Regions:
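Alpha/beta-hydrolase-fold serine-hydrolase catalytic core, especially in secreted/extracellular enzymes
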Residues: 2-13, 17-23, 148, 231-249, ...
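A catalytic-pocket lid/entrance helix-loop region that shapes and gates access to the active site
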Residues: 130, 134-205, 271, 290-335
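Accessory cap/linker subdomain of secreted extracellular hydrolases
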Residues: 71-74, 80, 144-259
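A short loop-to-beta-strand scaffold at the N-terminal edge of the catalytic core in hydrolase folds
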Residues: 21-37
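Cap/lid segment of the alpha/beta-hydrolase catalytic domain
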Residues: 36-119, 166-169, 174, 308-321
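Extended, hydrophobic alpha-helical segments in both membrane/secreted and soluble proteins
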Residues: 74, 90, 109-114, 127-129, ...
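Loop/turn elements at helix/coil->beta-strand transitions in domains of secreted/extracellular proteins
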Residues: 42-45, 81-84, 123-126, 148-152, ...
Length: 382
């Protein structure tokens, strides 16, 4: 398989973009090598808003056989094809100011970020978004406000249709992955990174042991040393009935489908992911009464593991991988999407299927050399 082309790029690092409340978010702008803002023709833009560090490794990206690629390298792939690429730290994360409250600031902050991009000399007024998991949530949150310039989206494994039913709770039952996520990310928070005592307190906790010491309460949890993370976690945990708190922007896209612009959207997830219901509900909701294409991909993977051909003890075979089966590679799939919808490139000769689903089963059932069952499967399309 040919490796994606990666070329040098120009960087406008650590642009501090002001939000409506005055908080500034750290933003990196990647431009094609030699590009002259204000002199050369403006460019279509690709945006990813992330809580995981705008210049850090993206664990699911793959280039030249390397799994886990720094975001600047991902940006260089797209800038080499004539796009501007923007990576931004979410509020309260890494270089951004403000207090992190999971999910609920992403709509207004995303809207304000697109408004800022639209004012820049390197932007031609057409913006696409991308991202996995939380970076899919940030996309859906901003789309619910119909922001200026939003022209297409690629959501991978996220973008809450209804956080009470899927993603934060499952049909009302609280997902304890929210607690493990909060603990892990609290250790990377500005509070912990700037205060060795806070970091030491977090690292001294045994998160597994804490799960044997239920119930937790404020001040008596592994997050007690970082109140902003403890507070939002308990707000989610206590909200055990579906009320107005679950209809908030950022965790309830199904209440905003009519507000989301009629633009091309690609939705991808996997049968063993936490966001199956979210992805299917968003597909159903966004295909009603719209002219723009909405495309669905459902693989047999775990969360973000689009080129891993097994899940647990089930082996699905080489056809299960995204790369080489649905497209040459995931970067190339997104490039073709953005060229089509941000640059009006001609569509391919073959019609783009509305849905591509991996149908599991049909294997021999025998164990392979790794001890997994040959479950098999094949891609089908509609």
């Amino acid at each position: 398989m040919t490796a994606p082309e990666v070329s040098p790029a120009a960087l406008l690092a650590d642009q501090m973009v002001r939000m409506r409340d005055g908080v500034r978010l750290a933003t990196d702008v990647h431009l094609p090598a030699g590009y002259r803002p204000g002199l050369d023709a403006p460019l279509p833009v690709i945006l990813e808003r992330t809580p995981y560090g705008k210049a850090e490794v993206s664990r699911s990206e793959q280039i030249d056989g390397r799994l886990g690629v720094p975001r600047p390298e991902v940006a260089r792939y797209f800038t080499a094809h004539g796009f501007a690429v923007v990576f931004q730290d979410c509020r309260g994360r890494y270089g951004s100011e403000g207090q992190f409250t999971k999910y609920l600031s992403e709509g207004p902050d995303g809207f304000d970020t697109l408004a800022w991009i639209m004012q820049q000399p390197w932007c031609n007024g057409r913006i696409g978004t991308m991202g996995l998991s939380y970076a899919a949530h940030t996309q859906m949150a901003l789309a619910c406000l119909n922001p200026p310039g939003l022209a297409c989206m690629v959501l991978d494994s996220g973008g809450f249709s209804n956080g009470y039913q899927c993603g934060i709770r499952q049909s009302g039952a609280f997902e304890l992955k929210q607690a493990t996520w909060a603990y892990k990310q609290a250790k990377l928070s500005p509070a912990a990174q700037q205060d060795p005592l806070v970091l030491a307190a977090l690292e001294a906790e045994d998160i597994r042991q804490w799960f044997t010491r239920m119930p937790w309460r404020p001040g008596h949890s592994p997050l007690a040393s970082v109140p902003e993370y403890e507070n939002y976690l308990f707000e989610q945990w206590r909200a055990d009935t579906f009320d107005e708190s679950w209809r908030q922007l950022g965790i309830y896209a199904e209440g905003y489908y009519d507000a989301i612009p009629d633009i091309p959207v690609a939705l991808m997830s996997s049968w063993y992911d936490a966001y199956v219901r979210t992805t299917l509900e968003n597909y159903a909701g966004l295909t009603q009464g719209r002219q723009s294409p909405v495309r669905l991909i459902m693989g047999p993977w775990l969360h973000g593991d689009r080129n891993t051909t097994h899940s647990g003890d089930a082996e699905f075979g080489p056809r299960a991988a995204f790369d080489g089966n649905l497209a040459q590679h995931w970067l190339g799939f997104r490039l073709a999407w953005y060229q089509r919808w941000l640059r009006d490139a001609p569509a391919g000769a073959a019609p783009d299927p509305a849905a591509r689903l991996f149908l599991m089963g049909g294997g021999s059932g025998a164990r392979d050399a790794q001890g997994r069952f040959d479950h098999g499967g094949a891609w089908i399309q509609a």
